[in-house]
Protein backbone atom coordinates (compact mmCIF):
# COMPACT_ATOMS: atom_id res chain seq x y z
CA UNK A 1 0.00 0.00 0.00
CA UNK A 2 2.80 2.43 0.87
CA UNK A 3 4.17 2.19 -2.66
CA UNK A 4 0.81 3.45 -3.96
CA UNK A 5 0.91 6.72 -1.97
CA UNK A 6 3.85 8.35 -3.81
CA UNK A 7 2.57 6.86 -7.07
CA UNK A 8 -0.81 8.57 -6.59
CA UNK A 9 0.88 11.88 -5.81
CA UNK A 10 3.06 11.69 -8.93
CA UNK A 11 0.12 10.68 -11.16
CA UNK A 12 -2.28 13.33 -9.83
CA UNK A 13 -0.21 16.43 -9.03
CA UNK A 14 0.41 18.62 -12.07
CA UNK A 15 2.55 21.67 -11.49
CA UNK A 16 0.65 23.83 -13.99
CA UNK A 17 -2.85 23.42 -12.51
CA UNK A 18 -2.10 25.79 -9.66
CA UNK A 19 -2.28 28.56 -12.27
CA UNK A 20 -6.01 27.99 -12.76
CA UNK A 21 -6.57 27.91 -8.99
CA UNK A 22 -4.56 31.13 -8.58
CA UNK A 23 -7.15 32.92 -10.73
CA UNK A 24 -9.50 32.54 -7.75
CA UNK A 25 -7.17 34.45 -5.41
CA UNK A 26 -6.58 33.53 -1.78
CA UNK A 27 -9.85 31.62 -1.43
CA UNK A 28 -8.40 28.86 -3.62
CA UNK A 29 -7.94 26.90 -0.37
CA UNK A 30 -11.67 26.18 -0.19
CA UNK A 31 -11.75 25.11 -3.82
CA UNK A 32 -8.92 22.59 -3.42
CA UNK A 33 -10.54 21.11 -0.30
CA UNK A 34 -13.93 20.87 -2.02
CA UNK A 35 -12.33 19.28 -5.07
CA UNK A 36 -10.70 16.62 -2.87
CA UNK A 37 -14.05 15.80 -1.24
CA UNK A 38 -16.26 15.83 -4.33
CA UNK A 39 -13.92 14.36 -6.96
CA UNK A 40 -10.67 12.86 -5.68
CA UNK A 41 -12.17 10.71 -2.91
CA UNK A 42 -15.07 9.52 -5.15
CA UNK A 43 -12.55 8.77 -7.90
CA UNK A 44 -10.43 6.71 -5.50
CA UNK A 45 -13.52 4.84 -4.31
CA UNK A 46 -14.72 3.96 -7.82
CA UNK A 47 -11.23 2.99 -9.01
CA UNK A 48 -10.74 0.82 -5.92
CA UNK A 49 -14.12 -0.86 -6.40
CA UNK A 50 -13.48 -1.59 -10.08
CA UNK A 51 -9.99 -2.90 -9.30
CA UNK A 52 -11.55 -5.22 -6.73
CA UNK A 53 -14.12 -6.57 -9.19
CA UNK A 54 -11.60 -6.89 -12.07
CA UNK A 55 -8.22 -7.17 -10.26
CA UNK A 56 -6.32 -8.39 -13.32
CA UNK A 57 -7.86 -6.02 -15.84
CA UNK A 58 -6.06 -2.75 -15.12
CA UNK A 59 -7.68 0.16 -16.85
CA UNK A 60 -10.94 1.90 -17.58
CA UNK A 61 -11.05 0.42 -21.09
CA UNK A 62 -11.30 -3.13 -19.76
CA UNK A 63 -13.73 -2.22 -16.96
CA UNK A 64 -16.06 -0.50 -19.41
CA UNK A 65 -15.80 -3.35 -21.93
CA UNK A 66 -16.76 -5.98 -19.34
CA UNK A 67 -19.40 -3.91 -17.52
CA UNK A 68 -21.04 -1.91 -20.31
CA UNK A 69 -20.04 -3.64 -23.54
CA UNK A 70 -17.37 -3.34 -26.26
CA UNK A 71 -18.74 -0.07 -27.67
CA UNK A 72 -18.36 1.68 -24.29
CA UNK A 73 -14.86 0.23 -23.98
CA UNK A 74 -13.88 1.45 -27.43
CA UNK A 75 -15.23 4.96 -26.84
CA UNK A 76 -13.30 5.06 -23.55
CA UNK A 77 -10.07 4.26 -25.37
CA UNK A 78 -10.93 6.62 -28.24
CA UNK A 79 -11.64 9.60 -26.01
CA UNK A 80 -8.55 8.93 -23.91
CA UNK A 81 -6.56 8.92 -27.14
CA UNK A 82 -8.17 12.22 -28.22
CA UNK A 83 -7.25 13.79 -24.89
CA UNK A 84 -3.65 12.57 -25.10
CA UNK A 85 -3.31 13.71 -28.71
CA UNK A 86 -4.55 17.21 -27.90
CA UNK A 87 -2.59 17.39 -24.65
CA UNK A 88 0.70 17.01 -26.49
CA UNK A 89 -0.30 19.17 -29.47
CA UNK A 90 0.22 22.38 -27.47
CA UNK A 91 3.94 21.64 -26.99
CA UNK A 92 4.90 24.50 -29.32
CA UNK A 93 2.76 27.03 -27.43
CA UNK A 94 4.04 26.00 -24.00
CA UNK A 95 7.66 25.87 -25.13
CA UNK A 96 7.43 29.36 -26.65
CA UNK A 97 5.94 30.66 -23.40
CA UNK A 98 8.71 29.06 -21.33
CA UNK A 99 11.44 30.48 -23.56
CA UNK A 100 9.89 33.96 -23.48
CA UNK A 101 10.07 33.96 -19.67
CA UNK A 102 13.43 32.20 -19.56
CA UNK A 103 15.14 34.77 -21.78
CA UNK A 104 13.68 37.74 -19.94
CA UNK A 105 11.32 40.66 -20.72
CA UNK A 106 12.98 41.50 -24.04
CA UNK A 107 11.84 38.09 -25.37
CA UNK A 108 8.13 38.54 -24.50
CA UNK A 109 7.29 38.75 -28.23
CA UNK A 110 8.09 35.03 -28.65
CA UNK A 111 4.92 33.92 -26.85
CA UNK A 112 2.56 35.16 -29.60
CA UNK A 113 4.76 34.78 -32.67
CA UNK A 114 2.76 32.31 -34.79
CA UNK A 115 5.59 31.49 -37.18
CA UNK A 116 8.00 30.74 -34.35
CA UNK A 117 5.42 28.64 -32.48
CA UNK A 118 4.79 26.65 -35.67
CA UNK A 119 8.53 26.08 -36.00
CA UNK A 120 8.78 24.91 -32.38
CA UNK A 121 5.84 22.56 -32.93
CA UNK A 122 7.38 20.90 -35.99
CA UNK A 123 10.92 20.60 -34.60
CA UNK A 124 9.86 19.32 -31.18
CA UNK A 125 7.58 16.66 -32.64
CA UNK A 126 10.45 15.49 -34.83
CA UNK A 127 12.48 15.13 -31.62
CA UNK A 128 9.61 13.26 -29.94
CA UNK A 129 9.38 10.96 -32.98
CA UNK A 130 13.12 10.26 -32.86
CA UNK A 131 12.97 9.47 -29.13
CA UNK A 132 10.02 7.07 -29.49
CA UNK A 133 11.06 5.06 -32.54
CA UNK A 134 13.78 3.02 -30.74
CA UNK A 135 11.37 2.14 -27.94
CA UNK A 136 11.72 1.91 -24.17
CA UNK A 137 15.54 1.91 -24.13
CA UNK A 138 15.67 5.68 -24.61
CA UNK A 139 12.12 6.42 -23.47
CA UNK A 140 12.65 5.28 -19.88
CA UNK A 141 15.49 7.76 -19.36
CA UNK A 142 13.37 10.50 -20.88
CA UNK A 143 10.59 9.58 -18.44
CA UNK A 144 12.95 9.59 -15.44
CA UNK A 145 14.29 13.01 -16.41
CA UNK A 146 10.81 14.50 -16.73
CA UNK A 147 9.72 13.10 -13.36
CA UNK A 148 12.87 14.34 -11.59
CA UNK A 149 12.45 17.88 -12.93
CA UNK A 150 8.75 17.91 -11.98
CA UNK A 151 9.56 16.92 -8.39
CA UNK A 152 12.38 19.49 -8.22
CA UNK A 153 10.18 22.34 -9.48
CA UNK A 154 7.33 21.36 -7.14
CA UNK A 155 9.67 21.58 -4.13
CA UNK A 156 11.12 24.86 -5.43
CA UNK A 157 7.66 26.42 -5.76
CA UNK A 158 6.74 25.49 -2.21
CA UNK A 159 10.07 26.86 -0.98
CA UNK A 160 9.50 30.20 -2.72
CA UNK A 161 6.45 30.74 -0.54
CA UNK A 162 8.73 31.06 2.49
CA UNK A 163 11.99 32.30 0.95
CA UNK A 164 12.09 35.33 -1.33
CA UNK A 165 15.39 35.36 -3.29
CA UNK A 166 15.83 39.12 -3.62
CA UNK A 167 14.18 40.31 -0.41
CA UNK A 168 16.24 42.19 2.17
CA UNK A 169 15.57 44.12 5.41
CA UNK A 170 15.73 47.33 3.40
CA UNK A 171 13.52 45.98 0.62
CA UNK A 172 11.17 43.33 2.05
CA UNK A 173 9.01 41.24 -0.24
CA UNK A 174 5.43 42.46 -0.58
CA UNK A 175 2.75 40.04 -1.74
CA UNK A 176 0.43 41.44 -4.45
CA UNK A 177 -2.44 39.83 -2.52
CA UNK A 178 -2.92 37.41 0.37
CA UNK A 179 -1.72 33.93 -0.75
CA UNK A 180 -4.34 32.29 1.48
CA UNK A 181 -7.73 33.40 2.74
CA UNK A 182 -10.16 31.67 5.09
CA UNK A 183 -12.97 33.96 3.95
CA UNK A 184 -15.83 32.42 2.04
CA UNK A 185 -15.43 32.75 -1.74
CA UNK A 186 -18.00 34.68 -3.75
CA UNK A 187 -19.93 32.20 -5.86
CA UNK A 188 -20.41 33.32 -9.44
CA UNK A 189 -20.54 31.54 -12.76
CA UNK A 190 -16.80 32.16 -13.16
CA UNK A 191 -15.88 30.78 -9.72
CA UNK A 192 -17.92 27.61 -10.34
CA UNK A 193 -16.20 27.34 -13.72
CA UNK A 194 -12.80 27.63 -12.01
CA UNK A 195 -13.77 25.04 -9.38
CA UNK A 196 -14.70 22.44 -11.99
CA UNK A 197 -11.41 23.03 -13.81
CA UNK A 198 -9.43 22.78 -10.57
CA UNK A 199 -11.14 19.51 -9.63
CA UNK A 200 -11.25 17.88 -13.05
CA UNK A 201 -7.82 18.96 -14.30
CA UNK A 202 -5.85 19.00 -11.08
CA UNK A 203 -7.14 15.85 -9.39
CA UNK A 204 -7.68 13.41 -12.26
CA UNK A 205 -5.35 10.61 -13.26
CA UNK A 206 -5.70 8.32 -10.24
CA UNK A 207 -7.26 5.59 -12.39
CA UNK A 208 -3.83 4.94 -13.91
CA UNK A 209 -2.85 3.26 -10.61
CA UNK A 210 -5.12 0.38 -11.65
CA UNK A 211 -2.56 -0.67 -14.25
CA UNK A 212 -0.72 -2.26 -11.31
CA UNK A 213 -3.82 -3.89 -9.77
CA UNK A 214 -2.64 -7.36 -10.74
CA UNK A 215 0.61 -6.78 -8.82
CA UNK A 216 -1.06 -5.41 -5.67
CA UNK A 217 -2.42 -7.56 -2.86
CA UNK A 218 -6.12 -6.80 -2.33
CA UNK A 219 -5.90 -4.01 -4.91
CA UNK A 220 -9.27 -2.39 -4.23
CA UNK A 221 -8.69 -1.95 -0.50
CA UNK A 222 -5.05 -0.90 -0.99
CA UNK A 223 -5.98 1.82 -3.49
CA UNK A 224 -8.68 3.23 -1.22
CA UNK A 225 -6.52 3.19 1.92
CA UNK A 226 -3.59 4.78 0.13
CA UNK A 227 -5.94 7.47 -1.20
CA UNK A 228 -6.89 8.48 2.36
CA UNK A 229 -3.18 9.09 3.01
CA UNK A 230 -2.45 10.73 -0.34
CA UNK A 231 -5.50 13.06 -0.31
CA UNK A 232 -4.34 15.45 2.46
CA UNK A 233 -0.79 15.43 1.07
CA UNK A 234 -2.05 16.33 -2.40
CA UNK A 235 -4.23 19.09 -0.93
CA UNK A 236 -1.28 20.59 0.98
CA UNK A 237 1.00 20.45 -2.09
CA UNK A 238 -1.57 22.17 -4.32
CA UNK A 239 -2.50 24.79 -1.72
CA UNK A 240 1.15 25.70 -1.09
CA UNK A 241 1.97 25.79 -4.82
CA UNK A 242 -1.01 28.03 -5.57
CA UNK A 243 -0.20 30.28 -2.62
CA UNK A 244 3.36 30.56 -3.91
CA UNK A 245 2.07 31.87 -7.25
CA UNK A 246 -0.12 34.43 -5.51
CA UNK A 247 2.87 35.61 -3.46
CA UNK A 248 4.47 36.94 -6.65
CA UNK A 249 1.79 37.41 -9.32
CA UNK A 250 -1.56 39.28 -9.15
CA UNK A 251 -4.41 36.79 -9.61
CA UNK A 252 -5.79 38.63 -12.64
CA UNK A 253 -2.42 38.47 -14.42
CA UNK A 254 -1.67 34.74 -14.05
CA UNK A 255 -0.51 33.37 -17.42
CA UNK A 256 -2.41 30.09 -17.92
CA UNK A 257 -0.12 28.94 -20.73
CA UNK A 258 2.95 29.22 -18.52
CA UNK A 259 2.20 29.86 -14.83
CA UNK A 260 5.35 28.08 -13.65
CA UNK A 261 7.79 29.97 -15.91
CA UNK A 262 5.93 33.15 -14.95
CA UNK A 263 6.34 32.68 -11.20
CA UNK A 264 9.98 31.61 -11.54
CA UNK A 265 10.70 34.70 -13.64
CA UNK A 266 8.97 36.92 -11.07
CA UNK A 267 10.59 35.29 -8.03
CA UNK A 268 14.12 35.36 -9.42
CA UNK A 269 13.87 38.74 -11.15
CA UNK A 270 16.96 40.92 -10.75
CA UNK A 271 16.92 42.63 -7.39
CA UNK A 272 19.98 44.83 -7.62
CA UNK A 273 21.35 47.33 -10.06
CA UNK A 274 24.99 46.26 -9.60
CA UNK A 275 27.07 45.07 -12.52
CA UNK A 276 27.86 41.75 -10.82
CA UNK A 277 26.26 38.55 -12.05
CA UNK A 278 22.87 37.95 -10.45
CA UNK A 279 23.10 34.22 -9.74
CA UNK A 280 19.53 34.07 -8.46
CA UNK A 281 18.27 35.49 -11.75
CA UNK A 282 20.44 33.04 -13.70
CA UNK A 283 19.17 30.11 -11.61
CA UNK A 284 15.55 31.10 -12.19
CA UNK A 285 15.98 31.39 -15.95
CA UNK A 286 17.94 28.14 -16.15
CA UNK A 287 15.18 26.36 -14.23
CA UNK A 288 12.58 27.69 -16.66
CA UNK A 289 14.52 26.37 -19.66
CA UNK A 290 15.14 22.98 -18.00
CA UNK A 291 11.41 22.80 -17.26
CA UNK A 292 10.70 23.36 -20.96
CA UNK A 293 12.94 20.39 -21.82
CA UNK A 294 11.19 18.29 -19.15
CA UNK A 295 7.82 19.17 -20.69
CA UNK A 296 8.97 17.77 -24.03
CA UNK A 297 10.19 14.64 -22.20
CA UNK A 298 6.79 14.15 -20.54
CA UNK A 299 5.00 14.61 -23.85
CA UNK A 300 7.30 12.03 -25.45
CA UNK A 301 6.08 9.51 -22.85
CA UNK A 302 2.42 10.37 -23.55
CA UNK A 303 3.02 9.84 -27.28
CA UNK A 304 4.61 6.46 -26.51
CA UNK A 305 1.55 5.38 -24.50
CA UNK A 306 -0.97 6.72 -27.00
CA UNK A 307 0.76 5.13 -30.00
CA UNK A 308 -0.17 1.70 -28.64
CA UNK A 309 -3.90 2.44 -28.97
CA UNK A 310 -4.02 2.26 -32.81
CA UNK A 311 -1.97 -0.93 -32.63
CA UNK A 312 -4.44 -2.57 -30.23
CA UNK A 313 -7.41 -1.31 -32.27
CA UNK A 314 -5.77 -2.91 -35.30
CA UNK A 315 -5.50 -6.22 -33.45
CA UNK A 316 -9.22 -6.01 -32.64
CA UNK A 317 -9.99 -5.37 -36.32
CA UNK A 318 -11.30 -1.83 -35.72
CA UNK A 319 -8.76 -0.17 -38.01
CA UNK A 320 -6.47 -1.51 -40.77
CA UNK A 321 -3.84 -4.09 -39.78
CA UNK A 322 -1.22 -1.70 -41.20
CA UNK A 323 -1.06 -0.10 -37.74
CA UNK A 324 -0.14 -3.39 -36.03
CA UNK A 325 3.12 -4.03 -37.85
CA UNK A 326 6.23 -3.69 -35.71
CA UNK A 327 9.58 -2.42 -36.88
CA UNK A 328 11.86 -5.43 -37.54
CA UNK A 329 14.81 -3.74 -35.81
CA UNK A 330 13.29 -1.97 -32.81
CA UNK A 331 10.12 -4.07 -32.38
CA UNK A 332 8.08 -0.91 -31.85
CA UNK A 333 4.84 0.22 -33.60
CA UNK A 334 6.68 2.81 -35.69
CA UNK A 335 3.70 3.35 -38.00
CA UNK A 336 1.36 4.12 -35.12
CA UNK A 337 3.96 6.43 -33.59
CA UNK A 338 4.41 8.28 -36.88
CA UNK A 339 0.64 8.73 -37.34
CA UNK A 340 0.17 10.00 -33.77
CA UNK A 341 3.04 12.48 -34.16
CA UNK A 342 1.71 13.67 -37.54
CA UNK A 343 -1.82 14.19 -36.15
CA UNK A 344 -0.55 16.02 -33.06
CA UNK A 345 1.64 18.26 -35.21
CA UNK A 346 -1.28 19.11 -37.50
CA UNK A 347 -3.58 19.87 -34.56
CA UNK A 348 -0.93 22.04 -32.93
CA UNK A 349 -0.49 24.09 -36.11
CA UNK A 350 -4.25 24.35 -36.68
CA UNK A 351 -5.04 25.52 -33.14
CA UNK A 352 -2.68 28.49 -33.29
CA UNK A 353 -4.00 29.77 -36.63
CA UNK A 354 -5.67 33.16 -36.19
CA UNK A 355 -5.62 33.19 -32.37
CA UNK A 356 -3.34 34.28 -29.55
CA UNK A 357 -1.42 31.78 -27.45
CA UNK A 358 -3.81 32.02 -24.48
CA UNK A 359 -6.91 31.36 -26.60
CA UNK A 360 -5.23 28.59 -28.62
CA UNK A 361 -4.16 26.88 -25.40
CA UNK A 362 -7.70 27.09 -24.04
CA UNK A 363 -9.22 25.63 -27.24
CA UNK A 364 -6.81 22.68 -27.27
CA UNK A 365 -7.21 22.10 -23.54
CA UNK A 366 -11.02 22.30 -23.67
CA UNK A 367 -11.50 19.92 -26.61
CA UNK A 368 -9.08 17.43 -25.05
CA UNK A 369 -10.87 17.62 -21.71
CA UNK A 370 -14.21 16.89 -23.37
CA UNK A 371 -12.64 13.59 -24.43
CA UNK A 372 -11.30 12.95 -20.94
CA UNK A 373 -14.69 13.90 -19.51
CA UNK A 374 -16.48 11.26 -21.61
CA UNK A 375 -13.84 8.76 -20.46
CA UNK A 376 -14.66 9.66 -16.83
CA UNK A 377 -18.43 9.66 -17.33
CA UNK A 378 -18.26 6.08 -18.57
CA UNK A 379 -16.03 5.06 -15.65
CA UNK A 380 -18.26 6.65 -12.98
CA UNK A 381 -21.33 5.04 -14.58
CA UNK A 382 -19.95 1.52 -14.07
CA UNK A 383 -20.87 1.07 -10.35
CA UNK A 384 -24.34 2.47 -11.06
CA UNK A 385 -25.10 0.20 -14.02
CA UNK A 386 -23.28 -3.08 -13.44
CA UNK A 387 -25.78 -4.48 -10.89
CA UNK A 388 -24.86 -7.92 -9.53
CA UNK A 389 -23.66 -9.44 -12.80
CA UNK A 390 -20.12 -9.83 -11.46
CA UNK A 391 -21.04 -10.93 -7.94
CA UNK A 392 -20.56 -7.56 -6.23
CA UNK A 393 -23.23 -4.85 -6.08
CA UNK A 394 -22.06 -1.34 -5.34
CA UNK A 395 -23.33 -0.21 -1.94
CA UNK A 396 -25.02 3.09 -1.10
CA UNK A 397 -21.81 5.01 -0.39
CA UNK A 398 -20.13 3.65 -3.50
CA UNK A 399 -23.09 4.74 -5.61
CA UNK A 400 -23.03 8.14 -3.89
CA UNK A 401 -19.34 8.47 -4.77
CA UNK A 402 -20.11 7.57 -8.39
CA UNK A 403 -22.90 10.17 -8.53
CA UNK A 404 -20.59 12.84 -7.07
CA UNK A 405 -17.91 12.03 -9.64
CA UNK A 406 -20.48 12.05 -12.45
CA UNK A 407 -21.87 15.42 -11.33
CA UNK A 408 -18.48 17.16 -11.08
CA UNK A 409 -17.36 15.69 -14.42
CA UNK A 410 -20.59 16.67 -16.20
CA UNK A 411 -20.42 20.19 -14.75
CA UNK A 412 -16.78 20.51 -15.82
CA UNK A 413 -17.69 19.43 -19.36
CA UNK A 414 -20.53 21.96 -19.54
CA UNK A 415 -18.14 24.77 -18.57
CA UNK A 416 -15.52 23.75 -21.12
CA UNK A 417 -17.24 25.90 -23.76
CA UNK A 418 -16.77 28.98 -21.55
CA UNK A 419 -13.27 30.51 -21.69
CA UNK A 420 -11.51 31.71 -18.54
CA UNK A 421 -9.22 34.04 -20.51
CA UNK A 422 -10.06 36.95 -22.79
CA UNK A 423 -10.91 35.72 -26.30
CA UNK A 424 -11.89 37.49 -29.51
CA UNK A 425 -15.38 35.97 -29.49
CA UNK A 426 -16.93 33.78 -26.79
CA UNK A 427 -19.43 32.38 -29.30
CA UNK A 428 -16.66 31.49 -31.72
CA UNK A 429 -14.70 29.86 -28.90
CA UNK A 430 -17.72 27.78 -27.83
CA UNK A 431 -18.45 26.78 -31.44
CA UNK A 432 -14.86 25.65 -32.00
CA UNK A 433 -14.82 23.55 -28.82
CA UNK A 434 -18.26 21.99 -29.36
CA UNK A 435 -17.75 21.40 -33.09
CA UNK A 436 -14.34 19.79 -32.68
CA UNK A 437 -15.61 17.57 -29.84
CA UNK A 438 -18.60 16.36 -31.87
CA UNK A 439 -16.42 15.71 -34.90
CA UNK A 440 -13.90 13.71 -32.84
CA UNK A 441 -16.59 11.47 -31.35
CA UNK A 442 -18.45 11.07 -34.65
CA UNK A 443 -15.19 9.83 -36.16
CA UNK A 444 -14.79 7.38 -33.27
CA UNK A 445 -18.31 5.99 -33.71
CA UNK A 446 -17.78 5.63 -37.46
CA UNK A 447 -14.50 3.77 -36.97
CA UNK A 448 -16.08 1.42 -34.42
CA UNK A 449 -19.08 0.48 -36.55
CA UNK A 450 -16.96 0.12 -39.66
CA UNK A 451 -14.65 -2.22 -37.76
CA UNK A 452 -17.59 -4.25 -36.46
CA UNK A 453 -19.08 -4.49 -39.95
CA UNK A 454 -15.81 -5.75 -41.39
CA UNK A 455 -15.40 -8.24 -38.53
CA UNK A 456 -18.81 -9.76 -39.31
CA UNK A 457 -17.98 -10.22 -42.99
Region annotations inferred by a language model:
Residues 62-64, 69, 101-106, 226-300, ...:
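TM-loop-TM module centered on a large, flexible mid-protein loop between adjacent transmembrane helices
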Residues 45-48, 75-138, 153, 164, ...:
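Helix-loop-helix module between adjacent transmembrane segments
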Residues 1-97, 200, 206-209, 216, ...:
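Transmembrane helix-boundary motif of multi-pass solute transporters/channels
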Amino acid sequence: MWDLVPMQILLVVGITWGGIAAKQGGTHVWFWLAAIVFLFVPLAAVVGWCAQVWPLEGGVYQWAKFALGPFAGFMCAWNFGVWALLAVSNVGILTATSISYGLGPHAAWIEDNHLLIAGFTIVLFLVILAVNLPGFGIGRWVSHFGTAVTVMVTLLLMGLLFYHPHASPAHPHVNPQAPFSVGKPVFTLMTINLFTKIAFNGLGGLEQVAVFAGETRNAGRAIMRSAWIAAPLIAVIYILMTGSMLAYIPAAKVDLTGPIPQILAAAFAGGSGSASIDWGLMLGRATILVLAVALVAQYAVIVAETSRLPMVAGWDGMIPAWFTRLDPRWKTPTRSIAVIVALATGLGLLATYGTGAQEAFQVINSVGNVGYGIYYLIMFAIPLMVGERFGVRAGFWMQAAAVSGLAVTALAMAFLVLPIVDVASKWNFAARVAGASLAMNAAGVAIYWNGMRQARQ
